[in-house]
From Swiss-Prot:
Cross-referenced InterPro entries: Photo_II_D1/D2_sf, Photo_RC_L/M, Photo_RC_L/M_CS, Photo_RC_M
One Pfam family cited in the UniProt record for this chain: Photo_RC
Keyword Iron-sulfur: no
Annotated positions binding Fe cation: H218, E233
Protein name: Reaction center protein M chain
Stretches that traverse the bilayer: 52-78, 110-139, 142-167, 197-225
Chaperone in keyword set: no
Species, as recorded: Pararhodospirillum photometricum
This protein's UniProt keywords: Bacteriochlorophyll, Chlorophyll, Chromophore, Electron transport, Iron, Magnesium, Membrane, Metal-binding, Photosynthesis, Reaction center, Transmembrane, Transmembrane helix, Transport
Assembly, per entry: Reaction center is composed of four bacteriochlorophylls, two bacteriopheophytins, two ubiquinones, one iron, and two highly hydrophobic polypeptide chains (designated L and M).
Binding site for a ubiquinone: W251
Amino acid sequence: MADYQNILTPCRFAPKPHHGVELPRGNWAEKARPIFVWLLGKIGDASSDHPPGVAGTVSAVLFAFAFLIIGANFLASVDWNPIEFIRLLPWLALEPPRPNWAWVLAPMNEGGWWQITGFFLTMSLLVWWWHVYNRARALGLGTHMAWAFASALFLYLTLGFIRPLLLGNWGEAVPFGLFAHLDWTAAFSLRYGNLYYNPFHMLSIAFLYGSAVLFAMHGATILAVSHLGGDREVEQITDRGTAAERAALFWRWTMG
């Protein structure tokens, strides 16, 4: 029986853990022992073979701090009522300090919690970027994912740090909250002209969603031929008669 499974396979079993690409001696991840998690197996016999490492763990902890602070502030705003928390969740927000506080650390209930949350969230994202970059280098892969993530980080830092820095106060930054950040976006659009008529905004959205669809098409196609070994044909992806070639033919014929 094959020991390779994916998210579409119905059978479940416990094979020996696969350690992946051999890492250089002395690498921290080399000494970690892979573990199997039964609950993760519910979505395709998944296992946490890949240890998060120091950077991944630090990033997760920092993100958890930011997430918990936002959640606690949301709960406090509805007087710690869980029913109201669920009912009003889309409208709840953690707002940045008012403009009069400029760049100083504001009191907790007047934007201080937002500043602390922003610090933890920003550090989490930066450390996770380092994790992605470092893992790619350690495994001998390209760093394309890290630089793609860096472009999203640049937008995040521009709206949450660089632009407020240039304008002189934290009040120009984006609030945390579903409708709150959408309202901020609408106000930003009205302030600087309608973004929907901005050609650069049009191009960025087209490339954003276009690349997302292309990545989804690629991932779904390779997953569909994984039972034929298509996901393991990295070096043979252009050879004739392979599963990856059949997948490529599908899209070639689809596009005429």
